[in-house]
Amino acid sequence: MTAHALPNPTELRLALRENGYCPVPVSGPGMNVNSAGKRPVMPAWERKCLDASPDEIRRWGTLYPDSTNTGLLCGLLAGVDIDVLRPDLTAAIADRARRILGPTPLERIGREPKVLLGYRLAIPADKIQTAGLMWTD
């Protein structure tokens, strides 16, 4: 197993901002909050993260020291979240998404084979969510 050095959350957030993203400080996995590791704890984070300056981003480390995870503000960023546990179906759905939407270098695998494909948008979009699908044997 190879050990990878994780970037300091502030350095990561500043780099994301420099590359045109809006970083969001997110609760660390050990915090005593609902959805720990996935939930922003900053009040009004949707507004504050939209135009946070580098100085503001540096302050987050002091104001929210337990928010060690980092999310990205959507709107001009969308994700195709493929939460399918069959590798063959995940691959087929991801291939179809890439054929329709185009290739993307932004790919995240959490619990394999589930995958999220990230795309930048030309104009902001509201969240679109499909109904949950249940497959029977």
Task: List each model region and its residues.
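Conserved phosphate/metal-binding and DNA-contacting active-site motifs used
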Residues: 1-137
